[in-house]
Design a protein with these regions (language model features):
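Active-site-proximal loop/hinge segments that shape catalytic or ion-binding/gating pockets
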Residues: 1-76, 83-120
Length: 120
C-alpha cells in the first residue's frame, strides 16, 4: 500500500468552508488557492481574519514531494468539519451564519483517482 492509499484509508474526506455566494464560481472553475482567487479577481466576499491572511501570505509549507511553497498557493481544507475556522465564522457572523455559509465535503479517494499529482 503506497502513501496515498494510506492517506485515503485514514482520511476519507476533506472539508472546505466558504460563503455560499462562492458556490457558482466553485461549480464553474473549481476550488482555487487564495493566490489564484486574487489573481483572477474572484474574491466577492471575504470572511477571513486579515491578520491571519497576512501571516499565511508569508508562510511556506513543505509538500510531500519535498518542494516548498507558500500556503496561499494551496487550498485550505480541513480533516474535520468542526474546526476553529468554522467556529470563528459562527462567532463573527452570528445566527445568519448557517444560511450564508457552506461546508463542502471532498472525497479524497476521488481526488487521487482523478489526478494522482494532487499529492504534490
Amino acid at each position: 500500500m503506497n502513501e496515498h492509499q494510506k492517506l485515503v484509508n485514514c482520511t476519507p474526506y476533506l472539508y472546505y468552508f466558504c460563503p455560499i455566494s462562492h458556490l457558482p464560481s466553485i461549480l464553474k472553475i473549481g476550488i482555487l488557492s487564495r493566490n489564484e482567487i486574487n489573481q483572477k479577481n474572484l474574491l466577492s466576499e471575504d470572511w477571513s481574519n486579515l491578520a491571519v491572511q497576512e501571516y499565511r501570505s508569508k508562510t511556506k509549507a513543505q509538500l510531500s514531494n519535498g518542494n516548498v511553497d507558500f500556503i496561499h498557493n494551496m487550498v485550505c481544507t480541513f480533516f474535520n468539519p468542526y474546526n476553529t475556522t468554522i467556529y470563528k465564522g459562527q462567532q463573527n457572523i452570528g445566527p445568519e451564519y448557517k444560511s450564508l455559509s457552506v461546508v463542502l465535503v471532498i472525497d479524497v479517494k476521488s481526488l487521487f483517482l482523478n489526478n494522482p499529482n494532487l499529492a504534490y
